[in-house]
Amino acid sequence: MKSLLAILALSLLWSAPALAQEKQHGGGAGHHDVGGGYVPKHGPPPVRNAPHPAPAPAEHPKYNDKEGHPEAPHVHTNGKWVGHDTGRDDARFHLAHPWEHGHFTGGFGRGHVWRLEGGDPHRFWFHGFYWMVADPDLGFCADWNWSGDDIVIYEDPDHVGWYLAYNTRLGTYCHVEYLGNG
């Protein structure tokens, strides 16, 4: 009987971390092909065709391209970036002084997953690197966990001075500006 209880106790101890991990990453976008820990191999391609115009201030573009997808720019698990289609001339992402705080050199893409360590959309950080979310994208990161979500940084091929921060749990991304380190 004692052996059976010991085995049961050990089984519970071994399964607890797996259950906690499942809970941490299981709160994604609610659809199996967005988020859930997926990390795209690369960022979005540059817009090559006639770009979609930036939405008018009163307009709200639709991003949930499938049932259950987030109403925010996101990436499918097949690598398709949804919502990055306005091109270089999108005035919402024009910076008077691109790279004002330098270039981010911490690493990009799949091999560089960063855990958010604190802050909010106006100033957040990880590993001594500081960032802020672009004003037009503030509504797209309201459900990010600023002290625990994993993100991946990609270079933005269309908007000079901006990067894209991709949230692996939710599968959503935002334009972010690098504010420097230290």
Residue ranges, per PLM feature:
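Extracytoplasmic low-complexity, disordered linker/stalk tracts in cell-surface/secreted proteins
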Residues: 1-93
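Low-complexity segments
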Residues: 60-182
